[in-house]
Amino acid sequence: MNLPVLNGPVKQDISVTCDGVSVFLIKGMGREAQTLLMRRAKTLKGTWCQVAGSIEKGETAWQAAAREVREETGITLQTIWSGDICEQFYEPEKERIALMPVFVGYVEDWVKVRLNDEHDAFEWVTFPQAHARVTFPGQRRTMQHVEKEFARHPPLDMLRIRLS
C-alpha cells in the first residue's frame, strides 16, 4: 500500500557553515591600488588566493582574520575593515555551502611579506591583474566588491575594526 506524500517529496538539506574568513590586503588607493595574492603550496596547489583560513574556537571572525594575516604573511595589522560581504562556495567533499566573512586590511609600501609554508610565492598586483590570476568566479566577484568599495576610495569608517 502506498501512503500519500504530504507536502511533496522528502527533501535533503545540506548544511551552510561559517567557519573561515577571507582577507584582502591592499596597498595604495585608486586605479594603481594593489592587492596581495599568494600561490598555494599544498591544498589547491598552484592556485592564487588572498589570505584565508579557519576561525579557531573562542575567536571572533575579525580576530581570526588578523591572526591569519599574521600567520600567512608575517604582517601585523592595527586596523581591519569589515568587507561588508561574504564569500560563498559549495564544497562537494563536505556536502555543504561555506560562507566566509570578508575583511580588508591596508598595508604601507615598506611592509615586507614573510610567507608561511602554506604558500610558495606572492605578488602585489593591480586588481585587473588579480582578476585574471585567481581561479574561482566567487573570488573574482568578491574582489570586484573589494576593489569598488575599498581600493577606489577610502572605506566607510563604520566598517573599521580597531585591533589594538
Residue ranges, per PLM feature:
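Acidic, metal-coordinating catalytic segment for phosphate/diphosphate chemistry
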Residues: 1-30
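Short, solvent-exposed loop/turn segments that connect beta-strands within catalytic domains
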Residues: 28-34, 93-95
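Conserved Nudix-box catalytic region and its N-terminal flanking loop in Nudix hydrolases
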Residues: 31-71, 75
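Nudix hydrolase/Nudix homology domain
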Residues: 44-46, 115-164
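Short aromatic/basic micro-patch
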Residues: 49, 97, 124
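Active-site segment of metal-dependent pyrophosphate-handling enzymes
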Residues: 74-111
